[in-house]
Design a protein with these regions (language model features):
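An N-terminal assembly and electron-transfer interface module characteristic of large anaerobic redox
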Residues: 1-347
């Protein structure tokens, strides 16, 4: 029963991760399923789809087509849509319905590539995992589909800078501006990367890891093509309300590991000497964790963790976490889209 949430909403699913990870690329995104799963992406998890809304399509498979397994109707519609929408390649994300009826993704890829003449990637997402699993999977598929040996250039790839991982447009712009002082070309996979940029991914001097989701891909690129990687280091804006902090007080940062680790680094740089811990409801890399850090499985884990740590003077996290207490002085609101979605972020 540990996965029964009584006070928190369900977390962003793997297909939301796929859609968010590639929504700014020059690709046609197809989310295959019925209205319920689609609503989770379009109304809760997708904060930036307005920029490329015309390239995100939902099949909204009907009950009769589900029962009869009528894939042909949907495939024909995808082909027609691909003729009207500019794109370099197609990515299809699954949901619980395709899983239940046993959709043959390999056949879909084969038929759509033959009919459209464009590369096609099918993601066997089911909605049972959280968003970062979808991001990891689609990044690896992009590497598998488009990577090839090319001549090295003075360029850099930024991978994992998605809105579900806490990256805003301003944050991306600042990181790119800093990197442009050192490199001739800076390619953010979350900023209109087309097929030409992806096919040159192995020409990079270095890859920048913007979230934990990027780790498997950058490690594969290092292993296969010798492209090193480093963690994104961007000077983050001061957390609103941080001025109330006692510099010797204990602080808990709840959120995506790369960003929260950067906040921790900045706290220490600014003279904070108290205990600073990072925890997250989504994947964390053990190598980046310090004593007291924790990967949380759900709200019961969070309550247990706060008790084990005897609470903190200050907690920085999504507003929905304030109800659990665990802080002696102040709770600072830093919304996490993958946790609360539009519920609080639109306010």
């Amino acid at each position: 029963m540990k996965n029964l949430f009584k006070r928190l909403p369900t977390f962003s699913a793997d297909y939301s991760g796929v859609c968010n990870a590639i929504q700014h690329m020059c690709c046609l995104i197809i989310l295959h399923g019925q209205g319920g799963c689609i609503g989770g992406v379009s109304t809760c998890d997708d904060f930036e789809k307005e920029k490329n809304e015309e390239r995100i399509l939902f099949t909204k498979i009907s009950e009769i087509d589900t029962v009869t397994g009528n894939d042909r109707k949907i495939l024909n519609q995808i082909v027609l849509d691909s003729q009207e929408i500019e794109h370099d390649f197609i990515v299809i994300a699954g949901s619980p319905i395709p899983m239940l009826i046993g959709t043959d993704w390999k056949a879909w890829v084969r038929e759509l590539e033959e009919a459209t003449g464009k590369p096609v990637i099918a993601m066997n997402t089911k909605g049972f995992l959280t968003y970062e699993e979808g991001e990891k999977a689609v990044f690896l598929e992009l590497e598998k589909k488009f990577s090839k040996p090319v001549k090295k250039e003075n360029r850099v790839n930024i991978i994992g800078d998605t809105c579900l991982s806490g990256w805003t447009e301003d944050r991306r712009t600042n990181l790119k501006s800093n990197l442009q002082r050192q490199y001739d070309k800076v390619i953010s996979w979350n900023d209109n990367a087309g097929i030409e940029e992806l096919q040159k991914m192995c020409s990079a001097s270095i890859n920048i890891v913007a979230s934990v989701s990027a780790l498997p891909t950058v490690r594969k690129l290092e292993e296969d093509y010798g492209v090193p990687y480093m963690i994104a280091e961007e000077e983050l804006k001061e957390i609103k309300g941080m001025g109330v902090f006692n510099k010797t007080g204990s602080i808990l940062l709840v959120g995506e590991q790369v960003i929260m680790n950067q906040y921790r680094k900045q706290f220490r740089k600014n003279g904070y000497t108290g205990r600073i811990s990072v925890c997250n409801f989504f994947e964390m890399n053990l190598e980046w964790m310090e004593e007291g850090d924790c990967r949380l499985e759900g709200e019961d884990d969070y309550i247990k963790y706060l008790k084990e740590q005897d609470g903190y003077e200050y907690i920085v996290g999504d507003p929905l976490l304030e109800q659990f207490g665990g802080y002696q002085k102040e709770f600072i609101n830093v919304p996490q889209i993958a946790l609360s979605g539009r519920l609080l972020n639109d306010r």
